[in-house]
């Protein structure tokens, strides 16, 4: 691996040590670093504009939120994603800034494993026509919004009604997202490599309605 896309938490202020390290790696190890159009203004000149067919890997600098945003770029460019934790919560990150040089050496020597993660495809329809489509690495949430009342939920699997209840909302979570919002709402933890998802009702009116794994 020689060509790396760089994705940053735009609110992170202590960028100078990171850019100095990347410049050193660029110069001493002949590595090429590229920025993405939405973050172009954040980077010095040696980090060039992205070339789609050039990327080998994307490096995400930040916490879990930054990693989740970068995951969409990983999907778009069809390359692996590695997280470098700069935030308070780095559950999804494999490396830290102090380990970055060693981690990149391992990538160059092909001393790594790519772990496949499940994605959710979410489609919102109105009058049976799609009005919104997106992919999610962690979860999709149906929520009552600003309304003070419960909403009626009917959940189907393979066109069969599984549960009907009144609640504040519903979380549909991948194994990756099972340790986040779903867990805080009483859902179980799934192994990251499982081919399954969790449906977690938010404050259901009936106590017998519990989180379900599919």
Predicted segments with their positions:
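Short glycine/serine/threonine-rich phosphate/pyrophosphate-binding segments
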Residues: 15, 66-70, 179-184
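N-terminal glycine-rich "phosphate-gripper" loop used for MgATP/nucleotide binding
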Residues: 60-64, 71-73
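Proline-centered loop/turn at the N-terminus of a beta-strand
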Residues: 32, 78-80
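Catalytic core of DAGKc-family lipid kinases
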Residues: 89-168
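Hydrophobic/aromatic beta-strand patches that form the interior of the parallel beta-sheet core
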Residues: 59, 82-84
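Redox-cofactor binding/interface segments in oxidoreductases and associated redox assembly factors
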Residues: 6, 60, 172
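Gly/Ser/Thr-rich active-site loops/lids in small-molecule metabolic enzymes
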Residues: 164-168, 172-208
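ATP/NTP phosphate-donor binding region
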Residues: 1-57, 97-113, 123-134
